[in-house]
């Protein structure tokens, strides 16, 4: 598997992702079942982005939702809103069968009942 992580890979243009994958592919043989994951922030999404990154080989997303609660997102200084998080996940489900969510539990005021 190849994992583009660190929180900001979704700032890369699809052509840049392709360039990196091509560079790695010159030195390593990829399995036909390779999993190529891209970490993304919800606020980096724009129409056509998922189709474009799939076209260059990304077949799994890891989405940095962090929380679906507005006040927690504000405490974390996240750029997206809770509604943005829900909207992006609806788009993710339309385009990817394989994805993960990064969620943060334990913010002040969090509790299991609420979650």
PLM region descriptions:
Residues 2-115:
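Conserved non-cysteine loop/helix-boundary elements of the Radical SAM core domain that shape
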């Amino acid at each position: 598997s190849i994992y583009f992580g660190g929180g900001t890979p979704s700032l890369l243009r699809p052509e840049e992702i392709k360039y990196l994958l091509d560079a790695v592919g010159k030195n390593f043989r990829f399995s036909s079942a390779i999993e190529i994951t891209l970490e993304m922030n919800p606020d980096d999404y724009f129409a056509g982005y998922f189709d474009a990154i799939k076209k260059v080989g990304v077949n799994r997303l890891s989405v940095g939702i962090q929380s679906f609660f507005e006040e927690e997102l504000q405490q974390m200084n996240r750029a997206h809103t809770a509604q943005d998080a829900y909207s992006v996940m609806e788009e993710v489900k339309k385009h990817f069968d394989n994805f993960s969510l990064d969620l943060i539990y334990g913010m002040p005021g969090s509790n299991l009942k609420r979650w």
